[in-house]
């Protein structure tokens, strides 16, 4: 799939701080496990092409909450960031703080099965992180949380994705059914103490555990396409918080 590079222009420089306006408190349950394939992404996700205009505006919600016409509202920037093009902090899955080294030996969840994680009160019966283990909830308050696998898939299936630049940072402008948009920067991921693929890929945790091995679901994208796939829990990834409508 051919994608044209686009330069994004920010509409505002509003700082992203915790705002609870318009947010509910109910957590969504997890549906059956399914992996998004490349063909599905190409069929249901509109990506920028040669007919797109040269410069696009990226809308930023004044309350730092963007209602894109989906099942949940999305934050305008990553957890720990003050602008939408910043990566914020990187987290291992089920952990609450950034760290200098991301590996299996110091991971709080990597070595455990989902059954064990339920017993340790890390996840619920739907394999979703409990609020006490959800970094977005702990950092921003009870109305915020990490997106589920289903919500990440909804973001892919129902939104228009356009690869380009915002303030010199590569990433995707994601526009919802109602025309509202967010920007997801391509800021890579941590393995060990090394940051990989910055400006090449975006790597975002969901709150949903994968039922095979030491993995959980993540929203990953490159210039080619976005997808939801399993990833080792010990790796450091960005988090884009959501809240209920």
Model regions: which residues?
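C-terminal motif of bacterial Sec signal peptides marking the signal peptidase cleavage site
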Residues: 21-22
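Short, low-complexity, disordered segments immediately C-terminal to signal peptides
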Residues: 27-41
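Hydrophobic single-pass membrane-insertion segments
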Residues: 26-27, 74
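Repetitive helical segments and hydrophobic/amphipathic motifs
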Residues: 16-18
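Intrinsically disordered, low-complexity repeat and linker tracts
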Residues: 45-57
């Amino acid at each position: 799939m051919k994608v044209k590079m686009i330069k994004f222009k920010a509409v505002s420089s509003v700082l992203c701080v915790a705002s609870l306006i318009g947010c509910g408190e109910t957590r969504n349950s997890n549906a059956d496990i399914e992996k998004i394939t490349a063909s599905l992404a190409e069929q249901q996700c509109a990506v920028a092409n040669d007919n797109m205009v040269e410069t696009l505006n990226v809308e930023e919600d004044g309350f730092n909450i963007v209602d894109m016409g989906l099942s949940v509202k999305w934050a305008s920037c990553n957890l720990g960031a003050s602008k939408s093009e910043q990566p914020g902090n990187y987290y291992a899955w089920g952990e609450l703080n950034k760290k200098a080294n991301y590996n299996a030996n110091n991971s709080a969840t990597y070595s455990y099965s989902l059954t064990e994680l339920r017993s340790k009160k890390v996840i619920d019966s739907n394999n979703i992180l409990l609020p006490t283990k959800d970094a977005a909830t702990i950092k921003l308050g009870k109305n915020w949380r990490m997106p589920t696998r289903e919500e990440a898939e909804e973001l892919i299936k129902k939104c228009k994705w356009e690869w380009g630049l915002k303030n010199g940072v590569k990433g995707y402008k994601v526009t919802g059914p109602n025309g509202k948009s967010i920007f997801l920067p391509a800021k890579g991921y941590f393995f060990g103490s090394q940051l990989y693929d910055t400006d090449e890929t975006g790597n975002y945790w969901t709150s949903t555990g994968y039922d095979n091995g030491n993995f959980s679901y993540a929203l990953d994208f490159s210039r080619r396409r976005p997808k939801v796939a399993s990833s080792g829990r010990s790796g450091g990834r960005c988090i884009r918080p959501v809240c209920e409508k």
